[in-house]
Amino acid sequence: MESKFVNDQTQLLPSKEQILTFPRFQSLPLDRIIVINHLEQCQDIEAELKTATLLGFDTESKPIFNKGDVQTGPHLIQLATFEKAYLFQVSADILNFLKPIFENADQIKVGFGLKNDAHLFRKKGIELKSVIELSKCFGGFGITNPVGVKNAIALLFQMNFPKSKSISTSNWSRKILTTPQIEYAAADAFAPVLIFEELLRLGQIPHDIPNTSLKLRIRPNKS
């Protein structure tokens, strides 16, 4: 019975073969991705970031391969709106700048696999508030298992969201990120914004988010 249930769940999502035939997911262009590593840059974007009611959210950490090694990440924190992605190379000053945003209950943060992120942020003295784990928002499709970002994009938009293991396991603590790292990190924060809006449009997310004063609305120009 358990095996049949898992198979039924799988059939509700596009197959790997189908996904390969879908058009490639279009993320933000490089000129809309801001890499931030100094407090002065934070001050330049403070107004636009702190007034955003919805933020896509993800983090990247330098991988650890040896037993007993301690994870010191996150080394990169990604936030995104519909228009821009912000990639923060973590320092004490940048964490202090981001702390009010992450602890603001009226700024919704959406993403995938955020349980470990919450643990890492707690170690840094930051309590994440109003965070929505999108992997668990597909019950209305008959899917009870967690759905990853790649399958979510395929299901909702019939697009292929590329995931590269070589990039995901690269050194995220390096001072100068490569262009593939920048594009990868931005997409991981931007995609959840689109997924959240589509789930909201389809009635899969309540318009009243607990512990906030927000009443979520779909963008007027959404077709």
Q: Predicted segment positions?
A:
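Conserved DEDDh/DEDDy metal-dependent 3′-5′ exonuclease domain
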Residues: 34-43, 50-54, 64-187, 191-198
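N-terminal accessory regions of nucleic-acid-interacting proteins
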Residues: 1-55, 134, 202-212, 217-223
